Amino acid sequence: MKNIMILSGAGLSAPSGLKTFRDNDGLWEEYDVMEVCSATGFRKNPKKVLDFYDARRAQLQNVKPNHAHEKIAQLKEKWGKNLFVITQNVDDLLERAGCKDVVHLHGFLPELRCLKCEGIFNIGYEKFTDKQCPKCKSKDLRHNIVMFEEQAPAYATLYSLLHQTSLFISIGTSGAVLPVEQYASMCEKSILNIYEKDVNLERYFDKIYIEDIISAIDKIALDIENFMKDGNV
């Protein structure tokens, strides 16, 4: 059986009410992105960065998975190991929708990482204050997020799975961080979902939905069905 990859970005979680720094409002309005999202910023003022991620965790607690998260969870349940679910998002909305085996390329907001033993543990939506590593008891901790100027270890997993993928689906990402047009070219068939027209990106894909993911996801699910039957989208 052929394999499918769904790679998602901020456009997947935006309908749930989660904003990114590109929206430049809400939580992000109060901060300089490079001060709170870069390795340099973290070295200069770790408390400011950790406070920022505390605020993001609190925000995450107040939103819910949307129809697209739930549909992807259903698709994963149906296609199992033949569907790779990869996301650039650091939220837990796919998991809360019931999706299994999600690969988070840029880290996971509910988790902290121990700088002493490299252990990773989940604190849910709690604040960073007074936490200690359950493994080595160290309090030398940080958020488990890949910041600007840092390596993303999960990219190795992404590229490994891409070489096994026949249908590539890009959801809610502009291609500014990852070269999704290259990924589309590596696969037999490809589908693009973006909110605004982008001719330079569209030309690499076989099928395009320029619309909100909430209205596109059921069509994409049908495309997957058709692809698994006869190899077409």
Mark where each language-model region is.
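Conserved catalytic core of sirtuin-type NAD+-dependent deacylases
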Residues: 1-233
